[in-house]
């Protein structure tokens, strides 16, 4: 059984569906859900132990406690950070903020987007080399030409001219210059 933690559907759901489809085609049972529901299902034994694939290993008290519950239910934790560190281009800082010794201890495997975050993780956390894998991201896989037809189906064809107003300015209001 594979449990895929989905936090922000607009950001993560397509790539989680890709992972789920590939895993299911190989005979795995896959469930995509929010973390709270998955933990409740595991703790109450409604869900059987398996792999809990989470969207980050950011070290926080809450995350560490949640991971303890997941591990105590019999699951293994794996992760790929959904935020990737690509914008700031300061992978070492990203690795220090988004990972910690305690959360790395709890994880069975950590997947990286590419060589930059992979090398930073290996350099900053050398005791966990055997857990860190350079796999790429399913979000990036969806950019490949083989998925163009997938994106065409979701394209909205406006009937009139329109104005797009973005309501997400995270990178624009970052403390430091990111570009």
Residue ranges and their predicted role:
Residues 2-155, 165-174:
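Active-site and donor-binding regions of nucleotide-sugar-utilizing enzymes
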Residues 176-179:
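A solvent-exposed, charged loop/short amphipathic helix patch at secondary-structure junctions
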